[in-house]
Amino acid sequence: MRFHIMTLFPEIFNSYMDESIMKRAVEKGIIEVHIYNIRDFSNNKHKKVDDYPFGGGAGMVMTPQPIYDTYKHIITTHNINNPSVIYLTPKGKVYNQSMAKQMSLKEDIILLCGHYEGIDERIIDLIVTDEISIGDYVLTGGELPALIMIDSISRLIPGVLNQEESFEEESFKDNLLEYPHYTRPRDFEGLKVPEVLLSGNHKKIDEWRREESIRITKERRFDLYKKSNEK
C-alpha cells in the first residue's frame, strides 16, 4: 500500500510517521508514505498557492495549477493508473470503518489536504474520486484527517499489527463498540475489576464482553446499535 499526501504542511506528518506502528509498517515495507509539498509545484515566482475567490467572499481559495501539477507528478513518477484521489473536506461523506476496510485493499491512495477556504472546484471535477469528512466539525486543514485515514487503513493491512486477530476485536466489529478493559491492580481507589473477568471461565467472559459491547453501543451510538440488530 502506498499513501501519497498532497499538502502545504509536510512537516506535520514527519513526527507521526516516525513513531510506533506506522514506523514499523514502513520499515517492514508493508506501507509507503510519500509526502509532496504542493507549494513546490507552483509556477508562481513567489510560490503562491492561493487567490481571492471569484464572486467575492471571505478567505482565500487554493489555486488549481499547483495541485494539478502535484497530482500529475505523483501518477507519472509512480506509474499509477485510475488512482483513488481523496479530498479531505467537511462537505464529504463521513468516514467510517467500512470505508477504511474498502480502502485497505487498494494499492495506491492519494490524499489531498485542503486549506484556507478550500480548493478550486475544477480540481474536484478533474482528479478527485472521493470527498471525505471525518466528522461534523471544521478543522484548519486536511492534514489531521489524512493522518486519521492513514492510521485506520494501515492497521487493517496484514502484517501491520503484531497480532492478526487484534484489530478484529476492536470497536465497530459487527457494528458494536468495544467492551471495557481492565488490568492490575484488582482494586484501584475502591473500584474493583468485575469478578467474571477473574473467574477463568472464558465462556462467561465472552458473554460479559458481548453484553457490555451491546450496552455501551446502545447508550452511546444508537445508530450502530440499530444496525447490529438488523443482522
Swiss-Prot record:
NCBIfam families reported for this sequence: PRK00026.1, trmD
A single BP term in Gene Ontology: tRNA N1-guanine methylation
InterPro entries from the UniProt entry: Alpha/beta_knot_MTases, tRNA_m1G_MeTrfase_C_sf, tRNA_m1G_MeTrfase_TrmD, tRNA_m1G_MTases_N, tRNA_MeTrfase_TRMD/TRM10
Residues reported in the UniProt entry to bind S-adenosyl-L-methionine: G114, I134, G135, D136, Y137, V138, L139
Protein name (record): tRNA (guanine-N(1)-)-methyltransferase
CDD domains linked: TrmD-like (cd18080)
Organism: Clostridioides difficile (strain 630) (Peptoclostridium difficile)
Compartment list: Cytoplasm
Catalytic activity entry: guanosine(37) in tRNA + S-adenosyl-L-methionine = N(1)-methylguanosine(37) in tRNA + S-adenosyl-L-homocysteine + H(+)
GO cellular component terms attached to this protein's record: cytosol
The protein's Enzyme Commission number: 2.1.1.228
Matches recorded under Pfam families: tRNA_m1G_MT
Family, per entry: Belongs to the RNA methyltransferase TrmD family.
Keyword annotations from UniProtKB, A to Z: Cytoplasm, Methyltransferase, S-adenosyl-L-methionine, Transferase, tRNA processing
Role noted for this protein: Specifically methylates guanosine-37 in various tRNAs.
One of the record's GO molecular function terms: tRNA (guanine(37)-N1)-methyltransferase activity
Gene this protein is translated from: trmD
Highest taxon of the lineage: Bacteria
Quaternary structure note: Homodimer.
